[in-house]
From Swiss-Prot:
The keyword Cytoplasm applies. It is an enzyme of class 2 (transferase). Its EC number is 2.3.1.274. Homodimer. Probably interacts with PlsY. It comes from Cupriavidus necator (strain ATCC 17699 / DSM 428 / KCTC 22496 / NCIMB 10442 / H16 / Stanier 337). NCBIfam families: plsX. SUPFAM superfamilies: Isocitrate/Isopropylmalate dehydrogenase-like (SSF53659). One of its GO terms (biological process) is fatty acid biosynthetic process. This is Phosphate acyltransferase. It comes from the Bacteria. Belongs to the PlsX family.
Length: 359
């Protein structure tokens, strides 16, 4: 089965200079992938020519005449830039011409455009942003929501947990992954009313609910999934990124302080290299917008080509493993109190029809 990925080539801080090389590199590693490169055709072709990939058989260029900048407000992205590379890329998913959309563009605009174009799945009130954060166990903890919903009701947190459970089950091949609810303590009496009520709903659900977890449990790998509202999740994510940068900077400073510390750095280099690979932020680039009728992956805006390629892989894995079908089934089962749930359709996306935007 061929997996087609739509790339918003113009998004992010670096645009085509990052997105196009990442797409071509990904194709060299995955024979069953195809790329739909969306954006300004001349800019895309210039990059392809530099990469000697102008006539690549698994690349299609789809024209978009506008670009959503990192500073554009949501209303501009939705109402004024209707032919933006971001919107056209998301539309490729809606029309079944691609299995996933990858964008490094403006997060607020991407969420708004994706929700407007794709709509939410049946039974899901709000989409959520989910990503993987490295942990001591080596596989990473899936955390959501990371900023899509600053305020949540208890039922939303339950929905987030179900969506993440479905994704982790098929992408990470973990049936019945454990779910933790981020709180200020493990005791059930702790937390605000929303969190306490969410805990009750999770305990009564079919999910493999571990209980309340604290911030340090994310890095311990206490549970496979950690659920929280978007305000808390975004603060946790940004704090993690800041701490990682600070530690890296401090280590570099200490090891370059004198000739002796430089010698120690040379001796410790094998260990430091292994640690750097385990904590490489590029490996964890790409946040999934869960709850939509199609796959959308948000890359970090400042990502380089190596990092953006990991975001492409996240979308590729989700499409190949049928994440949307799994989430659809999970919510169909929950809404079938009056009778047997209808099986969710397997939404494969080989891209059977030509796009009117093809350049």
């Amino acid at each position: 089965m061929t997996i087609k990925i739509a790339i918003d080539c113009m998004g992010g801080d670096h645009g085509v200079s990052v997105t196009v090389p990442a797409a071509i590199s990904f194709l060299s590693r995955h024979d069953d992938a195809e790329m739909v490169l969306v954006g300004l055709p001349d800019a895309i072709r210039t990059q392809l020519k530099k990469l000697h990939a102008l006539d690549h058989p698994r690349v299609t260029i789809v024209e978009a005449t506008e670009v959503i900048t990192m500073d554009d407000p949501v209303e501009v992205a939705l109402r004024k830039k209707r032919d933006s590379s971001m919107r056209v890329a998301v539309t490729q998913v809606k029309e079944g011409l691609a299995g996933a959309c990858i964008s490094a563009g403006n997060t607020g605009a991407l969420m708004a455009v994706s929700r407007y174009v794709l709509k939410t799945l049946e039974g899901i009130e709000r989409p959520a942003i989910a990503t993987t954060i490295p942990n001591e166990q080596g596989w990473g903890t899936t955390v959501l929501d990371l900023g899509a919903n600053a305020d949540c009701e208890p039922e939303h947190l339950l929905q987030f947990a179900r969506m993440a459970e479905a994704m982790v089950a098929v992408v990470d091949h973990k049936e019945h992954p454990t779910v933790g609810l981020l709180n200020i303590g493990e005791e059930v009496i702790k937390g605000n009313e929303v969190v306490k009520r969410a805990g009750e709903l999770l305990r009564a659900s079919e999910l493999n609910f571990y209980g309340n977890v604290e911030g340090n449990d994310i890095f311990k790998g206490t549970t496979d999934i950690v659920v929280c509202d978007g305000f808390v999740g975004n603060v946790a994510l940004k704090s993690t990124e800041g701490l990682a940068k600070m530690i890296g900077s401090m280590i570099k400073e200490e090891f370059t302080r004198s000739w002796f510390t430089k010698l120690l750095a040379a001796v410790a280099m094998p260990v430091l290299s292994r640690l750097a690979r385990r904590l490489d932020p590029a490996r964890y680039n790409g946040a999934s917008l869960l709850g939509l009728r199609g796959l959308v992956i948000k890359s970090h805006g400042s990502a380089d080509a190596h990092s953006f390629e990991w975001a492409i892989k996240r979308g590729y894995d989700a499409a190949k493993n049928g994440v949307i079908a799994r989430i659809t089934r999970a919510f169909a089962d929950k809404s079938s109190a009056a009778g047997a749930a209808q099986p969710a359709p397997e939404t494969e996306v080989p891209g059977a029809h030509p796009s009117p935007h093809v350049a």
